[in-house]
A protein has these predicted regions:
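Canonical Radical SAM [4Fe-4S] cluster-binding loop centered on the CxxxCxxC motif
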Residues: 48, 56-85
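C-terminal extensions
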Residues: 289-318, 345-393
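Conserved, mostly hydrophobic/aromatic
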Residues: 53, 66, 105, 162, ...
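Conserved C-terminal portion of the radical SAM core fold
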Residues: 159, 164, 168, 183-249, ...
Length: 393
């Protein structure tokens, strides 16, 4: 099998590793090289900046039989693996011409976790030592990676992640019974956390959940997410909507709506950037977030006693609770308040954000320019779930 054939197999398979967003541009290219576009995604470097990365599997061979995974050993699919030299031949020219600024590398369990992780680290070590590559590397560790390989990864990578896939041991047992929650997932993450506290792994730790594969609720996911941020010092948790794959035990399960993935991302932002506590989130009786409203707006509609807030007097925490205002627009408000008062809606034009939404929850110098509570509730009750939102508040 030549290198292009391998890449045509391994690059599309890596799309299941979630990143910040997709950066590839669609081009009218021959079908044989379409993998090149799908290989470019985004990740976050040590300084928190988004950068384009080359996303690739070193091998799609796997000894495990996870119920949701297209790479499971029971699937009859083309298999391929790259050598360290082949990885260098593919990756480094793209760095040199500016197409990418980093590497996101993962692998299937090709042999066993220790052997497969070792091969991946050998490839990165070759990039670092033989070829002098000093740029960004995000390594996806395998469950059950041994302590020595975690230490080695901490010395080689800017970011390390290990996918939990499910929020609890009970949920994991439904979709991946070969993995032990504590031994194979939490213990390696704890070791990686300890290394990150020494100053290694500058871009931090991350993980990913497959949303909807194990029958978990949004509350299940976000309770665990909160714990991961607090106790294991994760920098980021990603959510990927479950998609059924032919030939797997879950092939007949309905796909998870992408809007659910979006709502979880929005709730994650509330936890990380807006000062919300997990228990404040607007769950329904089944522990799920509403699909037709983003969680910040749903929370605000459920708490009319908190609104409207006076834009000229509210502190930062109060302003961050206002639908339509985010950290950037709130910082502008606080800065502009030192120069004068907000009196009319057109004074908000310089702020950015979803100002039409914010009007329903603020007063300007004591005057309210939004809809009354009944009209506001009626307006939002008519909304239908959307597949994607272009902006976060």
């Amino acid at each position: 099998m030549d290198l292009d054939d391998k890449l045509a197999i391994l690059s599309p398979a890596a799309r299941f590793d979630a990143c910040d967003r997709f950066l590839g541009k669609r081009r009218a290219t021959p079908r044989t090289v379409l993998w090149d576009d799908r290989a470019v995604a985004a990740d976050t470097d040590n300084a928190g900046r988004a950068l384009p990365v080359f996303r690739l599997l070193l091998s799609n061979r796997c000894e495990w039989n996870c119920a949701y995974c297209p790479l499971r050993s029971g699937n009859d699919i083309p298999r391929a693996a790259l050598t360290p030299d082949e990885l260098a031949r593919v990756f480094l020219p793209r760095v040199e011409r500016g197409a990418v600024q980093g590497l996101l590398l993962s692998t299937g369990v090709d042999g066993n976790p220790a052997v497969a992780t070792g091969r991946m680290l050998d490839a990165v070590e070759m990039l670092r030592t033989r070829y002098g590559y000093s740029g960004y590397v995000h390594l996806k560790l395998l469950p059950g990676a041994p302590a020595a390989e975690i230490e080695r990864a901490a010395r080689l990578a800017n970011r390390i992640s290990l996918n939990l896939e499910a929020p609890t041991a009970a949920h994991l047992a439904r979709i991946s019974p070969e993995r032990d929650w504590l031994r194979d997932l939490i213990a390696p993450l704890a070791l990686a956390r300890d290394w990150s506290r020494t100053g290694a792994i500058g871009a931090g730790l991350a993980t990913q959940f497959v949303v909807g594969a194990a029958g978990e609720s949004d509350r299940d996911l976000l309770v665990t997410t909160t714990w991961l941020y607090r106790d294991l010092a994760l920098r980021r948790v990603y959510f990927g909507a479950f998609r059924p794959v032919t030939g797997t035990p879950l092939e007949s399960r309905p796909p998870t709506p992408f809007v659910r993935e979006q709502r979880l991302r929005e709730a994650d932002w509330l936890l990380r950037r807006y000062g919300f506590e997990q228990q404040e989130l607007p769950y329904d009786p089944d522990g799920n977030l509403p699909l037709h409203l983003d969680p910040k707006l749903a929370w605000a509609l459920a708490h009319p006693e908190r609104f409207p807030v006076e834009l000229n007097r509210a502190d930062r925490d109060e302003l961050l609770r206002v639908p339509g205002l985010g950290p950037v627009s709130v910082a502008r408000i606080l800065r502009l308040r030192r120069e004068g008062r907000f009196r009319y809606p057109d004074h908000l034009a310089a702020l950015g954000g979803a100002l039409a939404r914010a009007r329903d929850f603020i007063t300007l110098d004591g005057r309210f320019f939004g809809r009354n509570e009944r009209d506001r509730l009626r307006h939002y009750a008519r909304r239908s779930p959307i597949a994607e939102q272009l902006t976060l508040w």
